[in-house]
């Protein structure tokens, strides 16, 4: 006969249980130790908000936080971070580009172009690169942690030339000289431009676009260098136009004798923009691109839209913007916007790159609607999706993201903040900071309240701005909560957990026997019953745990820890890859199951 005892855990630590069975003849005993954990956890509630730039001199936004009664007061902490610009965080990526150890054509270009762009913006703000060498302020208000420790990522390579203006000038000169030597005899560029190399249209367009950006930022080029590259692209575009026109020949026999092209493509759109920026407008290509706009990727549409804006083609531009808008996703909770690209069949091509597509769309919005909520949301999304902390996936997409953020900084006015930021809790002023371009990288960017400074109950946190410009802010409330029912929390990543009771069902299916006859065979079958909070289960019941994960960003690799309930044991006992649909590596531990996704 089985006998169960119900016990109550009165404290954390290790509990030793000794069971004895005593009789007059034979007796036995067993002793085991069990870990006893507190019914509680360190929990962080995250909040995001923005005080938009407006005509009104003073404006504010508020959030409401709740500090639980059942908690460890010494582990209560409220951190509020604020910034007048998120785009200014682009400077974090410069050291990566400068120190990139390889030197193909694109990498040679993007070692110095983003630094030059940033340098010119800083000069307009009355700053220089040396001013941000020892920057103390993390302008990305979404990131928590020690700003100084985060800044150490910049200094992997010492001394980093990106902060020395004389070194930057030498770096730019060397880059221009190397690109000049890599230019082929026909005026174009190849990948490495070595022996046997040929000019590639996309590579040449990338280089010419970069050199155009360089000249706009007062970089001196070798005479004729840029003109030869433009001439190569002009000839390339003329060929593509002719192929498109040949495809319109009605006589089939005559058309077969010609090289044809059925539709204008994404490369045509990129070359069209680069030549447009050189003052060369091919109206036939413009019309072909508009005719074939539905065949362009979202990336290609954004690039084409920039050229249309430059040419004053308002009607065509409005249609392109409308075409792109159907792929825009906006999230009011964390104030982001991004393109949900339908590029499952071509994501590995340059025109399917999601980061670059968002960057070029940001460049387009910086021209057409720089002060909209959507444009600011796109900036936030691009920053959120830095794959490597301070930079993105590659030198090229990092360079384009910096270029787009720089365009936004200039167009939105965020490069010239002039404001006072105040943080109030329950109407009481706790922080007041004056921010302008002179202290943008060194102002006090956070308020921290800990322990007894926060009482139990609800509190209203208000971020107030007086002056010019927006304020982006995030608040993080951390408690070691001891509540009987711990509620879920999350912002960028959310996890919902459900428990199901699995009840065995007698089920048979017909299969072929050893002689080919039809036989009934029992199969494993269960019905699922969802369990609610405080439902009771008994020892031996089989439960299924379901985790539903929602993510606002694209992540490469995450770990999810699912803490076990008291007395729960995993049915599977061997950790590793088990063929689950997510391809997750699973570790079964005493107190939790960890999923490496």
Feature-to-residue mapping (PLM):
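Secretory-pathway-linked proteins and extracytosolic
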Residues: 25, 29-158
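Extracellular-facing binding/remodeling surfaces
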Residues: 90-100, 181-193, 283, 287, ...
């Amino acid at each position: 006969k089985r006998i169960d005892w119900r016990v109550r855990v009165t404290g954390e630590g290790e509990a030793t249980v000794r069971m004895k069975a005593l009789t007059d003849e034979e007796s036995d005993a067993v002793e085991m130790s069990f870990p006893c954990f507190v019914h509680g956890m360190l929990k962080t509630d995250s909040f995001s908000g923005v005080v938009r730039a407006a005509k009104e001199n003073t404006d504010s936004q508020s959030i409401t936080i709740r500090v639980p009664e059942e908690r460890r007061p010494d582990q209560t902490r409220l951190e509020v971070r604020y910034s007048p610009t998120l785009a200014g965080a682009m400077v974090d990526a410069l050291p990566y580009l400068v120190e990139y150890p390889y030197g193909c054509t694109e990498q040679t270009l993007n070692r110095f172009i983003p630094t030059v762009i940033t340098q010119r913006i800083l000069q307009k703000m009355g700053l220089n690169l040396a001013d941000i060498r020892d920057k103390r302020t993390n302008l990305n208000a979404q990131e928590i942690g020690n700003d100084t420790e985060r800044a150490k990522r910049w200094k992997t390579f010492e001394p980093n030339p990106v902060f020395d203006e004389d070194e930057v000038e030498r770096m730019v000169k060397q880059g221009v000289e190397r690109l000049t030597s890599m230019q082929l005899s026909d005026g174009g560029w190849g990948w490495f431009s070595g022996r046997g190399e040929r000019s590639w249209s996309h590579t040449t367009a990338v280089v010419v676009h970069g050199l155009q950006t360089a000249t706009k930022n007062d970089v001196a080029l070798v005479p004729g260098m840029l003109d030869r590259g433009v001439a190569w692209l002009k000839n390339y575009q003329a060929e593509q136009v002719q192929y498109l026109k040949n495809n319109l020949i009605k006589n089939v026999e005559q058309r077969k004798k010609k090289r044809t092209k059925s539709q204008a493509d994404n490369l045509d759109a990129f070359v069209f923009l680069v030549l447009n920026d050189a003052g060369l407008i091919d109206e036939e290509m413009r019309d072909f691109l508009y005719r074939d706009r539905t065949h362009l990727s979202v990336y290609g549409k954004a690039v084409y839209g920039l050229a249309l804006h430059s040419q004053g083609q308002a009607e065509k531009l409005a249609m392109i913007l409308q075409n792109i808008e159907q792929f825009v996703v906006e999230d009011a909770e964390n104030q982001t916007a991004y393109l949900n690209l339908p590029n499952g069949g071509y994501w590995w091509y340059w025109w399917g790159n999601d980061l670059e597509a968002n960057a070029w769309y940001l460049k387009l919005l910086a021209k057409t609607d720089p002060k909209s909520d959507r444009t600011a949301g796109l900036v936030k999304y691009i920053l959120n999706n830095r794959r490597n902390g301070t930079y993105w996936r590659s030198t090229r997409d990092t360079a384009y993201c910096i270029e787009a953020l720089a365009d936004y900084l200039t167009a939105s006015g965020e490069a010239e903040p002039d404001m006072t930021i105040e943080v109030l809790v329950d109407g009481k002023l706790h922080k007041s900071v004056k921010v302008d371009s002179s202290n943008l990288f060194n102002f006090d960017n956070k308020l921290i309240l800990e322990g007894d400074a926060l009482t139990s109950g609800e509190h209203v946190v208000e971020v107030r701005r007086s002056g010019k410009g927006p304020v982006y802010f995030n608040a993080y409330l951390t408690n070691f909560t001891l509540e009987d029912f711990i509620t879920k929390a999350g912002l960028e990543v959310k996890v919902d957990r459900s428990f199901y009771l699995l009840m065995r069902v007698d089920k048979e299916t017909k299969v072929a026997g050893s002689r080919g006859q039809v036989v009934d065979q029992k199969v494993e079958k269960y019905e699922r019953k969802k369990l609610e909070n405080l439902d009771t289960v008994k020892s031996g019941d089989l439960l299924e745990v379901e985790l539903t994960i929602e993510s606002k960003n694209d992540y490469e690799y995450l770990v999810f820890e699912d803490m076990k309930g008291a007395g729960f044991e995993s049915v599977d006992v061997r950790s590793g890859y088990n063929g689950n649909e997510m391809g997750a590596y699973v570790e079964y531990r005493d107190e939790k199951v960890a999923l490496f996704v």
